């Protein structure tokens, strides 16, 4: 397991200090969302030049940190065709950048059927899934040309809300450059949290070969609502999850989420301890 942290969850004043602080905290990798992590200048498609990519790559090498995921979390199901085209171009810019910076993948969530990118029951329809796939295919085709992996992240409130739908997307697009980020908490809600073991097993049974990265946090139930917290402070079955990771994904990038500079070490130590204690499943 290669444990890391999101760049925008680390205290820093510059890209140089960002990667230095990630290394000082004992992390091996990061998820880099440029628009959130870069503080020196505004990030847009034109800013993502080879020069910037090589500079970040140099910082990574100097600090022994991988860019596990280059984040681009936009709406590929936007009903506004003009905005969708702009979004697809932004994904292509991130794909080019990922190929130069040495990122493991470009990560994305799976959108909503409205321009606001908000939850509606319509997100869970077959028509919504078809719309997302249509928006995703040109992006994956470009990723194939550039030798980059696109990784989709299922989220209950979004279009790909579970691993049955994730499997449908993977099969429909049918590309070796399309894989999956697995965040168990993202697909847990008030109606299914008691079946979390089943959800973890289903993810690996349906999509295990395509899981290329893990997002790690925890959850609590407060007044009937599932809320995310840092790893170790909630109800997620980490012994089961880490058994799957240890058995089937031993060196996978595992990125902590929802941490702050003053509690990242706590979450890191908890996850490492759970991994060390995890039993192999076969």
Question: What feature does the model see in each segment?
Answer:
Residues 234, 239-241, 246-248, 252-255:
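H/E-rich (His + Asp/Glu) clusters that bind or coordinate divalent metals
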Residues 6-10, 33-37, 72-75, 111-113, ...:
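Active-site beta-loop-alpha junctions enriched in small/polar residues
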Residues 1-103, 175, 179, 272-282:
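N-terminal pre-domain/capping segments
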Residues 12-16, 50-54, 92, 163, ...:
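Structural motif corresponding to alpha-helix initiation and N-cap regions
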Residues 38-43, 76-80, 114-122, 188-191, ...:
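A short acidic, helix-capping loop that chelates divalent metal ions and anchors anionic groups
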Residues 17, 54-55, 59-63, 78-180:
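Active-site acidic/histidine proton-transfer and metal-coordination neighborhood
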Residues 2, 30, 70, 133-235:
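Acidic/histidine-rich catalytic cores of soluble enzymes
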């Amino acid at each position: 397991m290669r444990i890391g942290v999101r760049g925008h969850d680390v205290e820093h004043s510059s890209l140089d200090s960002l990667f230095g602080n990630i290394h000082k905290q004992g992390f091996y990798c990061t998820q880099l969302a440029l628009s959130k992590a870069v503080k020196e200048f505004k990030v847009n498609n034109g800013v993502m030049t080879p020069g910037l990519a090589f500079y970040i790559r140099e910082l990574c090498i100097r600090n022994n940190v991988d860019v596990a995921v280059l984040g681009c979390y936009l709406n590929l199901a936007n009903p506004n065709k003009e905005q969708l085209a702009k979004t697809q171009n932004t994904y292509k810019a991130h794909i080019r950048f990922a190929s130069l910076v040495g990122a493991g993948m470009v990560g994305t969530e799976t959108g909503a059927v409205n321009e606001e990118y908000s939850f509606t029951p319509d997100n869970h329809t077959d028509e919504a899934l078809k719309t997302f796939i249509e928006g995703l295919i040109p992006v994956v085709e470009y990723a194939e040309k550039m030798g980059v992996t696109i990784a989709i992240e299922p989220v209950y409130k979004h279009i790909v809300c579970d691993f049955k739908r994730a499997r449908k997307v993977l099969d429909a697009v049918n590309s070796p450059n399309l894989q999956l980020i697995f965040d168990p908490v993202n697909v847990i809600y008030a109606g299914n949290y008691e079946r979390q073991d089943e959800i973890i097993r289903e993810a690996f049974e349906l999509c295990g070969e395509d899981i290329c990265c893990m997002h790690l946090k925890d959850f609590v139930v407060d007044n009937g609502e599932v809320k995310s917290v840092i790893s170790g402070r909630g109800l997620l079955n980490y012994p089961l999850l880490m058994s799957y990771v240890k058995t089937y994904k031993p060196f996978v990038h595992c990125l902590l989420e929802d941490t702050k500079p003053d509690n990242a070490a706590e979450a890191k130590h908890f996850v490492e301890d759970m991994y060390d204690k995890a039993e192999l499943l076969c």
